[in-house]
A protein has these predicted regions:
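Charge-dense, helix-prone N-terminal extensions
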Residues: 1-112
Length: 112
């Protein structure tokens, strides 16, 4: 669950994306592009990303460490990751997908 090394990897990958900044939401770090949240950390030490429903369904079926956040947030595509058990390529793919889901189209040209 909570791993400082995994947190650092997730944070570094998120902040490497174009125009991403780190802020706080309910006392936990989140990552935003042009003030739109696309990823962050949950209160219980997991990471989360914003996926579409189809992306979420596909990722949850393919990766046992990826699950919808419980309740209404999960039905909106918010997806938790036990990032301590994830490799960097999976995290990078999830973060890039989530970033693309919220970043303006003009910013996406040439990214990833």
């Amino acid at each position: 669950m909570n791993s400082p090394a995994a947190d650092q990897l997730f944070r570094g990958l998120a902040l490497a994306l174009p125009e991403v900044g780190e802020k706080s939401h309910f006392g936990k770090a989140d990552f935003r592009v042009r003030n739109k949240i696309f990823a962050g950390f949950t209160a219980d030490g997991l990471a989360y990303v914003k996926l579409t429903s189809d992306q979420q369904e596909m990722m949850c079926a393919a990766e046992p460490i990826v699950k919808p956040i419980k309740g209404g947030w999960g039905r909106q595509g918010w997806t938790q990751i036990d990032h301590a058990g994830a490799d960097g390529s999976l995290l990078q793919s999830l973060l890039l997908t989530a970033w693309r889901n919220v970043a303006p189209k003009s910013l996406q040209k040439g990214a990833g």
